A protein has these predicted regions:
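Helix-to-loop junction immediately C-terminal to a conserved catalytic motif
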Residues: 61
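Conserved ABC transporter NBD signature motif
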Residues: 69-77
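Conserved ABC ATPase "signature" region
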Residues: 77, 118, 126-146
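Conserved ABC ATPase signature
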Residues: 151-155, 159
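Hydrophobic anchor residue at the start of the ABC signature
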Residues: 165
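A short, proline-enriched helix->beta-strand linker immediately N-terminal to the Walker B motif
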Residues: 170-174
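Catalytic Walker B motif of ABC-type/P-loop ATPase nucleotide-binding domains
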Residues: 176-179
Length: 226
């Protein structure tokens, strides 16, 4: 299955498989998957609960390793990297929005958004100012600038989802992976979040979003079924 303009491919997956060993035996979650996604595409990953949507995104994010097959992000074969190089590559090139709203609760919204920019980077005064400015600009673009000094525990589900998007964008990565980003929010919030992803794709970001919600998939360029 392909959603490609042969040039400008951002994500390339070929014959990718992943299984897990459980007390009940081996479970093949992903079997021989192949697809390519071009830069600036907004693609949905669909399938039943437990079908492997989250596993696929986790592998593409470099958080898990496939059993077999190849994966390239922006021309880079991730399996060739050691943990240190992989972490640096991921921080620069991939924004990951997980199902778990994993915030540092004692940090403000602004601090949570800025955090990935400080990982592996300089923290001199000039750099801190630039990062803070970018974080505030992202919060403003997502309509939550007024929440910068709030704490995540005081926010609504929809507001927290926007904070996650801002945090994923802080390093300006070319690829955004979103795992059920509209889970537990109402239809209005779902439409708002999906419009944000659509705009990001139109600006050149490559978006891969796992979802079981037909409403969330309406603005996608295509779907990959697992």
């Amino acid at each position: 299955m392909k959603y490609i303009r042969e040039l400008n491919r951002m994500i390339q997956v070929k014959n990718l498989s992943k299984s897990f060993i459980t007390p009940r035996g081996r479970i093949d979650v992903l079997r021989d998957m192949s697809f390519s996604i071009s830069k600036g595409s907004f693609v949905g990953v669909t399938g039943k609960s437990g079908a492997g949507k989250s596993t696929l995104l986790s592998i593409i994010a470099g958080l898990q390793k496939q059993d077999s097959g190849s994966l390239m992000i922006n021309g880079t074969e991730l399996v060739t990297y050691d943990d240190k190089k992989l972490s640096a590559f991921r921080n620069k090139n991939i924004g990951f929005i997980s199902q778990e709203q994993s915030f540092l609760e004692n940090f403000t919204v602004l601090d949570n958004v800025r955090l990935p920019a400080f990982i592996g980077g300089k923290s001199d005064d000039t750099n801190v100012q630039e990062i803070t400015q970018r974080a505030n600009e992202l919060l403003d673009s997502l309509g939550i600038a007024h929440l910068a000094q709030n704490y995540p525990t005081t926010l609504s589900g929809g507001e927290n989802h926007r904070v996650l998007i801002a945090r994923a964008l802080i390093n300006d990565p070319p690829v955004i992976l979103a795992d059920e980003p509209t889970d537990s929010v109402d239809t209005e919030q779902t439409q708002s979040i999906i419009r944000i992803f659509r705009q990001l794709a139109d600006q050149g970001k490559t978006i891969l979003m796992a979802s079981h919600d037909p409403e969330a998939l309406k603005l996608c360029d295509g779907e990959i079924k697992v």
